[in-house]
Amino acid sequence: LVGSEMCIRDRIYDQALYRVYIEKGKFDYLYDKVGLYDKLRGVLCHQVSAAQLTYCWQSVDGIGGKMLNFLENHDEQRFASDQFAGDADKVLPALVVSSMMNTGPMMIYFGQELGERAEDAEGFSGKDGRTTIFDYWSVTTVRQWYDSGRCSVSKLSAKQKKLRNLYKTVLNISRLESAIVRGDFFDLMYVNGENPSFNPHRQYAFLRKYGNELLVIVVNFDDRQANVKINIPDHAFETMKIVSGKYEALELIGGDKEMKELSPEIPFACALSGYGAAVWKIELKNFSKEIQKK
């Protein structure tokens, strides 16, 4: 409850009932546990192909803005726990997809941005990769950040500080970029399934666009570096009103700038580190101005 407004959210295990709960139950948001969360976990644990992430947005098409995405909560095992990814540094591709695939909110569970591993054997809960909800307990990483009420990073390790800054960067992109907050979405996987310069089982790519701002988003769930070349079909150029040409592009996570070619004939080239991601922002109006000058 915030002021006079109440936000109602819940988790439903049957996706067929999502629309009923939203339309008739008047729920503001639903946790997409059995959709996006389960698929992302499956990809990270090498149980599911990244290509299956396409089904996640398709199954909630039209209500994607009502999905509350997450990578951790009170019931699930911590991302960095041995029972899940085993290392908080593997989070970037999943975090980017979860926070940028649709217009809905992203939830961060306490201590997630610090790489909490839930290694304690807490009372009733035991050592199960979760932070107990049954016992009075003090979570080490959160206690370090709380720092006796100072709420500072002074007691965090270098790795924790780096991870926290990464979360800050990605979440601010998803919060501030109009293409993500209210823009259109275009999945690129259907034209890259047999692409020799793209592994659809370990990489995922999509577009977001609002006005003249285009984001080319690609993630790598593999531990090896990948130099990918992504096919962008004619249909994307037509439906999103993209003009082919060379553009100056800014990579929003790392800050790199490059000239990128947008064309249905020439694949979009992108270098990705292991468990990396890239969010290339292109101002389409720049190209139009160049044409006008000529």
What is the role of each PLM region?
Residues I12-D14, E72-D75, W137, Y210, ...:
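Short, flexible loop/turn elements at secondary-structure junctions
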Residues L1-I8:
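Short, small-residue-biased leader/transition segments that mark boundaries at the very start
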Residues D38, G42, A51-T54, D61-N73, ...:
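Loop/helix patches that line or flank the sugar-binding groove of alpha-linked glycan CAZymes
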Residues R9-Y13, K241-I253:
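A generic structural motif
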Residues R9-A16, M189, G193:
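Short, surface-exposed recognition loops and adjoining beta-strand edges that mediate ligand/DNA contacts
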Residues K246-P267:
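Solvent-exposed beta-strand/loop surfaces of large extracellular or lumenal domains
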